[in-house]
Amino acid sequence: MTNSLTAFTSPDLSSSSGSACELNGRYSSRAPKGVRAAEEFTRTRLSKSFFMRDFLFSEIAAIEGLSNLPGDPKLAIAAGRGLCENLLEPLQATFGRLAIRSAYRSPEVNGFGCSHRLSCASNEKNRARHTWDRRDKNGHMGALTTVVVPWLVDRMAEGITWQAMAWWIHDNLPYSELQFFPKLLAFNIGWHEAPKRTIYSFIAPRGFLTKPGFPNHDGDHSHLYRGFPGPATQ
């Protein structure tokens, strides 16, 4: 292994770092009401390159006229910062611009997607995953987004595989879970306070590439992603 695995940073919910989404020096724990409040919230900077607005678009919400704003902005911001600072920034610094696909989903949006078979897991399963402002059953926060890495898409014809990207992330980033999809080799990447360290594929043959307890989980996997760049210094 490259031995460059970054220790994850858990954001401080009590922080008041000058973000646009603050209420009396603290992030609001209530959903933004009205256009101006929503605009202020979406200006919240999550990391060097990412703002909250980058993660709020939803085709389901747009087509069905549903709200995709978090009910607990304070928690959503903290979880989003964990995702951006620990995973998305180092991934983008190494491979270039990321395309964000499905990211935050409100319970209303996710519940609609689940009940209408629109590729959404249940609201319970998406706590601390796509639903950033809901802790999981153990009280942990987390955040997940679907990304496309154009660097990877451009190299598919050269024989670069999703497994190579998966093992690079496994060796170099403090992710919680990865799930890979056939179209554009998009994948879910999740940050979590108690990382699971699992990699799953919806690309045939479907199943786990690795998870704790698998014989391939530990050790050096660099031979599986030869030619990949080393982690960039941010």
Regions found by a protein language model. Give the residues of each.
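N-terminal, Lys/Arg- and Ser/Thr-rich interaction peptides
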Residues: T2-S4, T9-D12, S16-P73
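Catalytic cores and adjacent binding grooves of peptidoglycan-active enzymes
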Residues: T6-F8, D12-S16, L23, W132-Q234
